[in-house]
């Protein structure tokens, strides 16, 4: 497993070694020991989620507050997405900064988004299936959303006129969001 640092040090790309031949391929998609060594702490995943979306769908920017803050290990198993993490930790030197990574069934990369980040993605292919592990359970009461198009964050989304849920259309401005300390 190759671990790649992003512009935001706590957000990491995990790139598996893929062994292929005329029969197909094999890869180790997750290894707890390698993962914990890379992130520098013990992480216990408690839930796996799987979504399917069509081209142009944008989901985000989502996060949960304590005590239900979630770290996410995300990947795209069908198609391709542009995946984004926004640092919402007030005490961080990268507060308000974002990082974007293309994740696809072809590149098989995964992105680690720790607690204290808002997360979103948009679908670049005709359809995409998105799978992710979380280290905390979903909590409707602690769920929050930041407006995907907030000008103060200025994410360079590679889609025009995205398809959005009502929840994502009505996300909070970054300046009004609930941050992490």
UniProtKB/Swiss-Prot annotation:
Q: Which reaction does it catalyse?
A: dTDP-4-dehydro-6-deoxy-alpha-D-glucose = dTDP-4-dehydro-beta-L-rhamnose
Q: Which GO terms describe its molecular function?
A: dTDP-4-dehydrorhamnose 3,5-epimerase activity
Ranges in a coiled coil = none
Q: Which residues does the annotation say bind substrate?
A: 23, 28, 47-49, 59, 72, 119, 143, 167
* The EC number(s) this enzyme carries: 5.1.3.13
Tell whether Isomerase is among the UniProt keywords. Answer: yes
Active site located where?
Answer: 62 (proton acceptor), 132 (proton donor)
Marked site (Participates in a stacking interaction with the thymidine ring of dTDP-4-oxo-6-deoxyglucose) residue numbers? 138
Q: Which UniProt keywords apply?
A: Carbohydrate metabolism, Isomerase, Lipopolysaccharide biosynthesis
GO BP of this protein: dTDP-rhamnose biosynthetic process; lipopolysaccharide biosynthetic process; O antigen biosynthetic process; polysaccharide biosynthetic process
- Report the Pfam families cross-referenced here: dTDP_sugar_isom
**Which pathway does it serve?**
Carbohydrate biosynthesis; dTDP-L-rhamnose biosynthesis; Bacterial outer membrane biogenesis; LPS O-antigen biosynthesis
Any one GO cellular component localisation term in the record: cytosol
Show the PANTHER family listed in the entry: DTDP-6-DEOXY-D-GLUCOSE-3,5 EPIMERASE, THYMIDINE DIPHOSPHO-4-KETO-RHAMNOSE 3,5-EPIMERASE
Q: What does this protein do?
A: Catalyzes the epimerization of the C3' and C5'positions of dTDP-6-deoxy-D-xylo-4-hexulose, forming dTDP-6-deoxy-L-lyxo-4-hexulose.
Q: What family is this protein classified in?
A: Belongs to the dTDP-4-dehydrorhamnose 3,5-epimerase family.
Q: How does it assemble?
A: Homodimer.
Q: What is this protein called?
A: dTDP-4-dehydrorhamnose 3,5-epimerase
Species name for this entry?
A: Shigella flexneri
Q: Per UniProt, what is the name of the gene that codes for the protein in this document? A: rfbC
């Amino acid at each position: 497993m190759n671990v790649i640092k992003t512009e935001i040090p706590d957000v990491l790309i995990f790139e598996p070694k893929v062994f292929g031949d005329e029969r197909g391929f094999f890869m180790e998609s997750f290894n707890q020991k390698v993962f914990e060594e890379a992130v520098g702490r013990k992480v216990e995943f408690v839930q796996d989620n799987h979504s399917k979306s069509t081209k142009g769908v944008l989901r985000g920017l989502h996060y949960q507050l304590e005590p239900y803050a979630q770290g996410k290990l995300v990947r795209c198993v069908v198609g391709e997405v542009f995946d984004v993490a926004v640092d919402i930790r007030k005490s961080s030197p990268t507060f308000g900064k974002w990082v974007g990574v293309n994740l696809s069934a072809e590149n098989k990369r995964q992105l680690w988004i720790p607690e204290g980040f808002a997360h979103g993605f948009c679908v670049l292919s005709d359809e995409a299936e998105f799978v992710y592990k979380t280290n905390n359970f979903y909590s409707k009461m602690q769920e929050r959303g930041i407006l995907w198009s907030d000008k103060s964050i200025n994410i360079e989304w590679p889609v025009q006129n995205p398809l959005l849920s009502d929840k994502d259309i009505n996300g909070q401005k970054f300046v009004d969001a609930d941050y992490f300390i």
